[in-house]
Structures are given as structure tokens and as C-alpha cells.
Amino acid sequence: MFTGIIEETGTIESMKKAGHAMALTIKCSKILEDVHLGDSIAVNGICLTVTDFTKNQFTVDVMPETVKATSLNDLTKGSKVNLERAMAANGRFGGHFVSGHVDGTAEITRIEEKSNAVYYDLKMDPSLTKTLVLKGSITVDGVSLTIFGLTEDTVTISLIPHTISETIFSEKTIGSKVNIECDMIGKYMYRFLHKANENKTQQTITKAFLSENGF
């Protein structure tokens, strides 16, 4: 479990592909202070497991399904990535509940600076936006953010200069792809209500069918 508060940015040191899977080695410093084999680290919002580490870098393995569902294929040696360690039970909770299980990707279609904030439009599949609400939470490349605009296929977010400077958003341009994790509470609520409506419809159809057939 993560919070969406980025601890530092790291640099891709190497990418080794094996078929559709890959191993990433990432150079960093702060998050290695108490790292152990098997620890979970969110890399651009993707929960990955540490398989090896030294004093200034760590390695994670990435399954084919994860590669396919995320923007990892867009990374190259030298790319910057957002990093966050799994939340400690006694730590502060500054963002929102983030699982590190990416739901899909989005494309940045607008970047506009207004006063002390920068607004980004993120175009994504409508299957993602249906679980979202205005002023609700969304995770973008591992960063916990608030939704300021919402249509069927576009989400608008806003970042202050501090967040931009402390994350890889400083390198984003129009056309950049980002990882999206929808708020898990919203997903559970949508699933619950959707199933409830399905059951209600099925029950109504069953009663009507029986009545029409003399039962």
C-alpha cells in the first residue's frame, strides 16, 4: 500500500528485456536507506518487488502483463521515474490509498499554466473515467492528485510548482503517456452498485418471465 506522495525521483540505469518481460535497475538514494530484498517500491505508480540492490541502486522484475498495461515501454536508459516506498504502519498518511496496481494509461493533451498552478488534461479510455468523481482522487505516475475536471474521456488535474519540481512532471510534454490508478474506493463503490443493479434487473426479468408463463 502506498500514499501517492513521491519520496524522490530515480534514474533508469539499465533495462534488460526477456521476451515481453523486463528487469529494471534504478539509481537513487533516499529510498535505499532501509531497503530489503522483497520490499515493494512504487515506480511511476507501479508496485514492483526489489530483487537486488546496492548502496546506490535497486533492481525489480516486471511481468509481461504489467509491461503491457503501463507506460514502462516508453522508458529508456536515463529516464527519470517517481519512487515511493510502501507505507509504514506508523507513518503519516498524506495522500490517499494507492495500491500500485495500474488500471491503464492516459495521454497528456493539454498543459496550461495559470497563476501558481499548472493544469494537465489527460485523455483516457472511458472505462477508467466511469469510476471517478469531481474533487475525487486519482493517481498519475504514482502521484496522488485531485480531479478538477471530468468528461467521458478526459480528466483535468492541477499541480503546484513544488509537486512539479519534486516529480517527473517537470519533464512531461503534450503527448506524454502516464500511468493511471483510479481511486480504489470509487472502484469498489462502482462495482458494488453495478452488481446491485444487475441483480435487480435479473430478478425483475425472472419474475416477469414466470408471470407470463402462468407461474
Swiss-Prot record:
Q: Where are the Lumazine-binding repeats?
A: 1-96, 97-193
Q: What is this protein called?
A: Riboflavin synthase
Please describe the quaternary structure of this protein. Homotrimer. Can interact with 6,7-dimethyl-8-ribityllumazine synthase, forming a lumazine synthase/riboflavin synthase complex, also designated as 'heavy riboflavin synthase complex', which consists of a trimer of riboflavin synthase enclosed within an icosahedral structure composed of 60 subunits of 6,7-dimethyl-8-ribityllumazine synthase.
What positions does the entry give for 2,4-dihydroxypteridine 2 binding?
Answer: 47-49, 61-66, 100-102, 135
Which EC number(s) does UniProt give?
A: 2.5.1.9
Q: Which InterPro entries match?
A: ATP_synth_asu-like_sf, Lumazine-bd, Lumazine-bd_dom, Riboflavin_synthase-like_b-brl
Quick one: which residues bind 2,4-dihydroxypteridine 1? 4-6, 144-146, 158-163
Task: List the keywords (alphabetical).
Answer: Repeat, Riboflavin biosynthesis, Transferase
**How does the record characterize pH dependence?**
Optimum pH is 7.4.
Q: Which Pfam families does its entry note? A: Lum_binding (PF00677)
Q: Among the record's GO biological process terms, what is one? A: riboflavin biosynthetic process
Summarizing activity control, the record says:
Is activated by sulfite ions.
Care to name a GO molecular-function term for this sequence?
A: riboflavin synthase activity
List the pathway annotation: Cofactor biosynthesis; riboflavin biosynthesis; riboflavin from 2-hydroxy-3-oxobutyl phosphate and 5-amino-6-(D-ribitylamino)uracil: step 2/2
As for what it does, the entry says: Catalyzes the dismutation of two molecules of 6,7-dimethyl-8-ribityllumazine, resulting in the formation of riboflavin and 5-amino-6-(D-ribitylamino)uracil.
Q: Which EC class is the enzyme in?
A: transferase
From what organism does this protein derive? Bacillus subtilis (strain 168)
Recorded catalytic activity of this chain's protein: 2 6,7-dimethyl-8-(1-D-ribityl)lumazine + H(+) = 5-amino-6-(D-ribitylamino)uracil + riboflavin
TM ranges are none
